[in-house]
């Protein structure tokens, strides 16, 4: 973990293709990207990276939800070792509601979760059917820098 006091961050973008349903393979891609970006403070992954996109009805299966959560928790523990934090898209079950989420993994923990607010429901996108809309999130404090963490369409509008 890089802990230098600063108001700047080195961010690596992991523009990778995940495979729908291949939780273990997608988690391994995240590990390799973290190792490749050892110089960065944060590695950012695509929406729903752990599940693969679009996961459609697969995210409704409890075993799949549990597998995604387990992979995120394992990746979080791995951030206790030196290296960058991870910002990873994943389905996340919270109080009986399933969210399209992004998890900030740092210092060995899931240090923040943000849920997608603006769920699309057109063309191939059917997120309103499978995900709950999250509350409008505020920024997170990450290593002394305030970060907004919108997911996809959450950043498209003025609100």
Give the positions of each predicted feature:
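Enzyme catalytic cores with a strong preference for nitrogen-chemistry domains
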Residues: 1-159
């Amino acid at each position: 973990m890089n802990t230098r006091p600063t108001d700047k961050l080195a961010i690596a973008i992991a523009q990778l293709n995940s495979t729908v349903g291949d939780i273990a393979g997608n988690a391994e891609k995240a590990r390799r990207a973290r190792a490749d970006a050892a110089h960065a403070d944060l590695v950012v992954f695509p929406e729903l990276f752990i599940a693969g996109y679009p996961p459609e009805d697969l995210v409704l299966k409890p075993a799949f939800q549990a597998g995604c959560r387990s992979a995120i928790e394992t990746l979080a523990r791995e951030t206790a070792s030196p290296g960058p934090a991870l910002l990873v898209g994943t389905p996340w079950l919270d109080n009986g509601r399933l969210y399209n989420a992004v998890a900030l993994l740092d210092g060995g923990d899931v240090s923040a979760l943000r849920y997608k607010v603006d769920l699309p429901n057109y063309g191939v996108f059917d997120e309103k059917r499978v995900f709950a809309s999250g509350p409008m999130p505020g920024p997170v404090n990450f290593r002394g820098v305030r970060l907004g963490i919108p997911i996809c369409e959450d950043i498209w509008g003025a609100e």
